[in-house]
Regions:
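Surface loop/turn signatures of beta-propeller and other carbohydrate-active proteins
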Residues: 1-26, 45-48, 62-90, 120-148, ...
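Histidine-centered active-site/metal-ligand motif
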Residues: 14, 36, 55
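Predominantly extracellular/luminal cell-surface or secreted proteins
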Residues: 40, 58, 100, 114-116, ...
Length: 491
C-alpha cells in the first residue's frame, strides 16, 4: 500500500494538479499518440478566477504527465478574465482548441481559438474572435464543442434561450474559419421546469445513426446543477429525442463532463469534474479544490440506455489484492470483511434480502463511528449511498443519494457493482452502466476496513474482491507556461 501523502484527501489516481483550483475538463483529444486532457485551472489560487487551461497527456490512460499551462488569459485581451471551457481537435498535424473568451461585464463568452504545432506545449491565439456575437434571443452563450461529421465541421455552443429553455446551438463550417449558425440543435422543454435553465458544456457522441447529447444544467440562481443525457437521432440539423432525458450521473458531485473520441472505432471516453463537498474554509486550508473523475467508457445499448464504466485500461492500476470474501449474513451485526487501502478498486455481487437492505460499509475510524454506507433497497429498487456519517469533521457535507436498480426488486437476483475509492472520492458503478459519484472526507484514526450488513429477517449474500490501486503512473509537477507569468495575481 503506497504511503499516504501529507494531505490524506488529495486523490492519488484521479487527475488534478497538486494544488489550487480546477473545474471543467476541456479539450479532450487523441493527438500524436497521446490522450490530451485539458482542464479549467487557476494556477495561483483557490477561487474560480484567473482561469487557464491546464494540461495532462498520456500514451495509455495510465501514465500521465502534467505539461505547462496551455492557455492563459491575455491582459487587456478578449479573454482577459478567463479562458473558459471548450474542446480541441487534431487536424493537419496541429491541435486546435476552441474556447470561451471571458471578460467581466460581458454576459456572453464568445468563441475563439488557439493552435499548437508541438503537441500542446506552445500555443498561438487567433488575433480576433472566431464568433464574436451570440444569436438574438439568447441569455447565456458559452462552451463550444467541435467535431467532424460527414466531411463537415460542426459546433455546438451551450446557451439559454430568452424563453427560459436551455439549448445547444448548432454551427457548421467547411474550413474551421467561417461558421454558419443553423439554430438550436436541441432545446429543453418549457414544461420540464418553471425556472430558466441554461445548458453548459454540450457534448455529442455518435453511435452509427444514433446520437447521445450530454448537457450540464445551469440555473441563474444556483449555478451548476447536474448533468442530463438525451438520446435520439438527428434529422435535418435537429436532434430528435427518442426517450426522455435522464441524469448521466446520480451523485451530487459530478458536472461538466467532456468527451474524447478514442482512436478505436466507436469508442468514446468521458471525464467529469467532481467539485468539493466540504466548506470552503477546509478546502482553503488544504490548498486545493476539485478533481477530475476517472476516465469512463460511454456506451449506448440497443434499447437506448446510456452506460458508463471505468476505462478498461484502469485494470492495470490494480496492485495487491486486499481481500476476497464470499458469504451470507442473516444477523443484525455486520460481518467484518477485512482491511482496505485508502485508494482501492472493488467488485462485489450482492443478493439482497428482499425484506430488508443489504450492502457494504466502508469504516474509516477505529471506533466505527465514521463510515460510508452503500446499500441495495429491494423495496425501492434502488442503490443508496449515505455519507451522513462519512466524516467526523462537521465541515464535510452530508446527504443520502441513490440511483435506480430495478434488478434489486427481483428476489434472488444478484446485483453487480464496481466501486473505486480514492481518498476523498467514490465512483460507484452498476454493471448495467449507471453511476453515482460523490466526495467524502474521512478523518478517523486506524486502518480502513469493509463490512457487509443486512437489515431484514432473511439473508443477504455477498461476494467481494478488492485491490489496492497503484498511483505510480501519475507524474504531477506544478509547471506554468511562460505566458502565464505576466498574469500572476493574488486570487
Amino acid at each position: 500500500v503506497p504511503t499516504p501523502p501529507a494531505d490524506p484527501h488529495l486523490p492519488a489516481v484521479h487527475l488534478r494538479p497538486p494544488r489550487n483550483w480546477i473545474n471543467d475538463p476541456n479539450g479532450m483529444v487523441f493527438h500524436d499518440g497521446h490522450y490530451h486532457v485539458f482542464f479549467q485551472y487557476n494556477p495561483y489560487g483557490l477561487l474560480h478566477a484567473n482561469v487557464h487551461w491546464g494540461h495532462f497527456r498520456s500514451p495509455d490512460l495510465i501514465t500521465w504527465e502534467q505539461l505547462p499551462v496551455a492557455l492563459a488569459p491575455t491582459p487587456g485581451g478578449d479573454d482577459a478574465d478567463g479562458c473558459f471551457s471548450g474542446n480541441a481537435i487534431s487536424v493537419d498535424g496541429r491541435l486546435l482548441a476552441f474556447y470561451s473568451a471571458n471578460r467581466t461585464g460581458r454576459w456572453w463568452q464568445p468563441v475563439t481559438t488557439a493552435e499548437s504545432y508541438d503537441g500542446g506545449l506552445a500555443w498561438t491565439k487567433r488575433p480576433e474572435l472566431l464568433i464574436p456575437q451570440p444569436p438574438a434571443d439568447t441569455t447565456m452563450y458559452r462552451d463550444p464543442y467541435v467535431w467532424q461529421q460527414d466531411g463537415r465541421w460542426r459546433m455546438l455552443v451551450g446557451s439559454a434561450l430568452a424563453d427560459g429553455r436551455g439549448a445547444a446551438l448548432l454551427y457548421e463550417s467547411d474550413d474551421l474559419e467561417n461558421w454558419v449558425h443553423r439554430g438550436p440543435f436541441h432545446a429543453g422543454s418549457l414544461a420540464a421546469t418553471d425556472d430558466p435553465v441554461g445548458w453548459e458544456c454540450p457534448q455529442y457522441a455518435t453511435f452509427g445513426d444514433r446520437g447521445v447529447l450530454v448537457v450540464s444544467d445551469w440555473t441563474p440562481d444556483d449555478g451548476p446543477s447536474h448533468v442530463t443525457v438525451h438520446t435520439g437521432r438527428e434529422e435535418e440539423g435537429r436532434f430528435r429525442s427518442t426517450a426522455p432525458p435522464v441524469r448521466l450521473d446520480h451523485g451530487p458531485d459530478f458536472y461538466a463532463p467532456a468527451l474524447l473520441k478514442a482512436p478505436e472505432e466507436g469508442r468514446w471516453l468521458l471525464w467529469g469534474w467532481s467539485w468539493e463537498a466540504r466548506d470552503d474554509s477546509w478546502a482553503h486550508e488544504a490548498g486545493w479544490a476539485g478533481t477530475l473523475t476517472l476516465p469512463r467508457e460511454l456506451t449506448l445499448a440497443d434499447d437506448g440506455t446510456v452506460g458508463q464504466h471505468p476505462a478498461r485500461e484502469l485494470l492495470a492500476l490494480r496492485g495487491e489484492r486486499l481481500l476476497h470474501r464470499t458469504g451470507c449474513i442473516a444477523e443484525p451485526e455486520p460481518v467484518e470483511l477485512g482491511q482496505v487501502s485508502h485508494t482501492f478498486d472493488l467488485t462485489t455481487t450482492l443478493t439482497p434480502d428482499p425484506t430488508g437492505t443489504t450492502g457494504l460499509r466502508l469504516v474509516t475510524s477505529g471506533d466505527g463511528t465514521e463510515y460510508l454506507d452503500i446499500s441495495l433497497d429491494p423495496a425501492a429498487g434502488r442503490l443508496t449511498v449515505d455519507r451522513g456519517h462519512a466524516s467526523l469533521d462537521v465541515r464535510a457535507w452530508a446527504g443520502v443519494y441513490s440511483l435506480p436498480c430495478p434488478a434489486a426488486k427481483v428476489p434472488g437476483t444478484p446485483v453487480e457493482l464496481r466501486i473505486v475509492v480514492d481518498r476523498s472520492i467514490a465512483e460507484i458503478y452498476l454493471a448495467t452502466g449507471q453511476v453515482l459519484t460523490l466526495r467524502f472526507y474521512p478523518v478517523g484514526d486506524g486502518p480502513w476496513r469493509l463490512q457487509a450488513h443486512s437489515t431484514g429477517p432473511g439473508a443477504g449474500c455477498f461476494t467481494v474482491e478488492a485491490w489496492a490501486l497503484d498511483p505510480g503512473g501519475i507524474h504531477q509537477e506544478p509547471l506554468l507556461a511562460a505566458q502565464g507569468q505576466d498574469n500572476m495575481t493574488a486570487q
